Amino acid sequence: IMKNLKDKIVFITGSAQGLGYSMAEKFAAEGSHIVLADIKAEKVVESAKAIADKYGVETMPVQLDVSSVPAIIEAFAKVKERFGRLDVLVNCAGIQIRCPSKEFPEEKYDKVLDINLKGTFFCCQQAGVLMGEKGGAIVNISSGNSVRPTPGRAPYAISKAGVNALTKVLAAEWGEDVNGKHAIRVNAIAPGFIATDLLLDGLHMGIISEKQIEAVLPYRRMATPEEIADVAVFLASDEARYVTGQVLFADGG
């Protein structure tokens, strides 16, 4: 248990289910109070209640479409009103759309970039304002596709490469507050294949097979959401107090 995360206020986007929900559980297990933000209004309320009941921490469900900057500003204003501060942000909301590049329609391209990159930027912006001089930690979720793209997912790869660059820029901008003592640390995790419902649906649809996944991974299996969440908890904790501007590849090799 990382005691320095107890009673911290942690804002997690895309946390109604999947990887984001696993993140929320891991931080709650450390004693953090969780703001669960997700576009799925009913589901995020259910998830917030489940975590509060299981871990005995405070939770706050927020319906949030991260592609909307006004909605992001409003969500962080609600956090300020409720808690008065923010200690950790995890940008987990994201989508991917498969389509050959020669046929990719503009509206789908915009949707991927708006959620994955614009949403991440403006959530970081508002978190940075709320964290202020007290400092904090931001963990962005990138992807192995940011450096090893696969066919048919060009906008996704572009968006995640942008997340990597954003992570490094913000780490440089926000690393010198009060001689670094109260800096805002900004890091990213670049997972590979994760056994989430989204990927398992792809397996069932025949888009990719487990054998194909195992063939390219030295570890010979997909990650569990909990394994990626453990990395996020580490990066947000004081154990990683000298780690910033890094893109950590948690991809099984």
Model-derived features: positions:
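Substrate-binding pocket helix/loop in short-chain dehydrogenase/reductase
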Residues: 100-101, 105-113, 209, 213
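Residue(s) in the substrate-gating loop at a strand-loop-helix junction
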Residues: 143
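C-terminal substrate-recognition "lid" of short-chain dehydrogenase/reductases
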Residues: 221-250
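A glycine/serine/threonine-rich, flexible loop-to-helix segment
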Residues: 176-181, 193-216
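Active-site loop immediately N-terminal to the catalytic Tyr-X3-Lys motif
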Residues: 102, 148-154, 220, 238
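Short, small/polar-rich loop/turn modules that mediate ligand/substrate recognition or access, typified
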Residues: 175, 180-185, 243-245
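Active-site helix of classical SDR
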Residues: 124, 159, 167
